[in-house]
């Protein structure tokens, strides 16, 4: 099962419809975090530290569905925490899929095969498996031996059963570029739809701040890792990959990925949680975005995350015929605007 063309048509129509309505800011992807608890303790993860006081809290199925409805985006990215730990994750996924929204569920794959027994394959559903390198590098990054093998088996099993599968990789300072390239080739050869990639964001709650990569250093890494001649299938759209290489610039549009958590909607964005609100419309105000973004808030200075800039490439492509044609030729609208946690 490959990338559905229906997503390309629906996403394009959705954007044009909102533009006609005169909406300057609106969501492309609902980032849904039904819990923040995880069964791993990755060094670069800010969520399990930031939400330490509510790790036992679950968002109910009905509240998840209401958040998706309030946002209205055609794409839902389920993150966390580890979503498969939610006792009703199958109901959350299946009921959103029943609405014909496209669901991407992030997972470390430890419980993925168990979840497959309750969530059937669908063109509207895709596993996004976290992979940070080949076996030694990945197991080191998640602080547990054997996770790479478990994830690899789960990916193979899911593909064999007809599920859509992608991977998601976070690039940190000091990464082994050759190891990343080998992993991307490995996943491409396994038959995943593509590999998502993004630099790690500098969460202040993470003790080891040397882990995070600067914007300048990240672009040097991506110029090498994203070399098109390697034949790797990347899931991010080609304009965003150009941005990662430093070949183009965009203004952050993180409002396009509103994030719902056990405490409500994160404000202002998926990465920064200065406060939480119960009204998603608060995230689209002019006043709010006068305060955030590169050059406005120092915390945004090194950010290259797809949740802020991949959507920006989509919005701009629709106003630049050359970029739009390139997106169509490379089949990129099927996966455009995806942000994975």
Regions found by a protein language model. Give the residues of each.
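Radical SAM enzyme [4Fe-4S]-AdoMet core and its adjacent flexible, acidic
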Residues: 59-60, 125-132, 140-267, 271, ...
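Short, charged, surface-exposed secondary-structure boundary motifs
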Residues: 115, 137-141
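Short, P/G- and charge-enriched loop/turn segments at secondary-structure junctions
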Residues: 17-21, 243-247, 289-290
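The −1 position to Zn-ligating cysteines in a subset of zinc-ribbon hairpins
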Residues: 37, 41, 251, 299-302
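Conserved alpha-helical substructure of the radical SAM core
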Residues: 2-118, 122-123, 330-333, 341
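Flexible mid-to-C-terminal extensions adjoining Fe-S/redox cofactors in radical SAM and related proteins
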Residues: 26, 265-341
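Short, solvent-exposed turn/loop segments enriched in Gly/Ser/Thr/Pro and often Arg
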Residues: 81-82, 198, 309
